[in-house]
Amino acid sequence: MARYTGPAWKLSRRLGISLSGTGKELEKRPYAPGPHGPNQRKKLSEYGLQLQEKQKLRHMYGMTERQFRRTFDQAGKMPGKHGENFMILLEARLDNLVYRMGLARTRRAARQLVNHGHIMVDGARVDIPSYRVKPGQTISVREKSNSLVVVKEAIEVNNFVPEYLTFDADKLEATYTRHAERSELPAEINEALIVEFYSR
């Protein structure tokens, strides 16, 4: 299944969750798009709830189904809870951590920064958004890219960097000190439903 490239606001309203992280998509119309408006949402079956939860998380991180399922399978080989491990692996993606650093306003914008070669890991350019960052590694913006307007604007409005990142705003650099804990990850996601979906 290909990555969704349509309007983020429309998908956010359909899934009932802010994919941009700003919440603006749901401020005025917190219901699915379409002619039926707020009356369109219907009670979902157990399978429907599981599928919806999977789609919410997959689109939140901007992944294809193949990438998403591969990461899920990798999480299943780790000790501990499958669902929590899955969330932790998703959070360790390079494009996501660029977003968490506040270098981009959305994960989609962060993915573009990585794709276009503006981001380095431990001093080496990495242009693979799905690159999994390991604790202790340092993420930074290339010196030639420090003056990017999109980065400056994102930094100005960002007022929160998670505790598993130590961020230096002057250097535009952060160290991924440890894996995130479940309490630091999206509370609106029920990963148990996703585990149930793939276990069918």
UniProtKB/Swiss-Prot annotation:
Domain of life: Bacteria
Region (Disordered): 22-42
Gene3D superfamilies: Ribosomal Protein S4 Delta 41, Chain A, domain 1, RNA-binding S4 domain
Cleavable signal peptide: none
Boundaries of every S4 RNA-binding domain copy: 92-152
Keywords tagged on the record: Ribonucleoprotein, Ribosomal protein, RNA-binding, rRNA-binding
InterPro entries assigned to the protein according to its UniProt record, in alphabetical order: Ribosomal_uS4, Ribosomal_uS4_bac-type, Ribosomal_uS4_CS, Ribosomal_uS4_N, S4_RNA-bd, S4_RNA-bd_sf
Annotated GO biological process: ribosomal small subunit biogenesis; translation
PANTHER family associated with the record: 30S 40S RIBOSOMAL PROTEIN (PTHR11831), SMALL RIBOSOMAL SUBUNIT PROTEIN US4M (PTHR11831:SF4)
Protein family per UniProt: Belongs to the universal ribosomal protein uS4 family.
Quaternary data: Part of the 30S ribosomal subunit. Contacts protein S5. The interaction surface between S4 and S5 is involved in control of translational fidelity.
Function recorded in the entry: One of the primary rRNA binding proteins, it binds directly to 16S rRNA where it nucleates assembly of the body of the 30S subunit.
Name of the protein: Small ribosomal subunit protein uS4
The organism of origin for this protein: Bacillus cereus (strain ATCC 14579 / DSM 31 / CCUG 7414 / JCM 2152 / NBRC 15305 / NCIMB 9373 / NCTC 2599 / NRRL B-3711)
